[in-house]
């Protein structure tokens, strides 16, 4: 059969690898230009996550899956592939904390920050024009494609204010604190 996997993060890549290993024809669709999802971004502070993404990406390619990055999956695009099965692995849904001010323009979620730093969503929380221009230039020049460069540059400059409060002391919050 033909398995279509929507989402190129670790869950989607593992589903694709497993399906291809069982003899299925596999197509992976991911709207981002790079595989890995949040794990790829988190490799900025936790390089092992990047190793996992590289391993899964290589395993999926070696298994013969058709990987289509920069492709938004819609009902029409998926149906056109005539799959016998569809796996939706689009990642976790995170919500903003229900606290006063959480929706103010200068308040960023981890997803907002990822969108800014990778250039994937420059309108995430409406940063100033200069910041959007700098980040757009970085994306056009390919700077945001290389997480090593993003890591090095983020040590010198972040597209947010000088005073930062991080809400949450779990893994993501502590990883994020390494930027500041």
Language model feature labels by segment:
Residues 31-39:
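NAD(P)-binding Rossmann-fold cofactor-contacting core
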């Amino acid at each position: 059969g033909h398995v279509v996997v929507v989402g190129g993060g670790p869950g989607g890549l593992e589903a694709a690898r497993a399906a291809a290993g069982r003899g299925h024809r596999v197509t992976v669709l991911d709207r981002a230009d790079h595989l890995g999802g949040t794990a790829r971004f988190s490799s900025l502070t936790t390089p092992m996550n990047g190793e996992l993404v590289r391993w899964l990406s290589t395993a999926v390619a070696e298994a013969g899956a058709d990987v289509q990055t920069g492709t938004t999956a819609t009902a029409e695009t998926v149906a056109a592939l005539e799959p016998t099965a569809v796996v939706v692995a689009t990642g976790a849904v995170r919500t903003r904390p229900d606290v006063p001010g959480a929706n103010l323009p200068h308040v960023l979620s981890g997803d907002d920050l990822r969108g800014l730093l990778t250039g994937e969503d420059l309108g995430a929380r409406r940063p100033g024009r200069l910041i959007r221009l700098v980040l757009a230039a970085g994306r056009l020049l390919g700077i945001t494609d290389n997480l090593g460069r993003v890591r090095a540059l983020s040590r010198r400059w972040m597209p947010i204010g000088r005073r930062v409060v991080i809400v949450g002391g779990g893994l993501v919050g502590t990883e994020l604190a390494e930027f500041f």
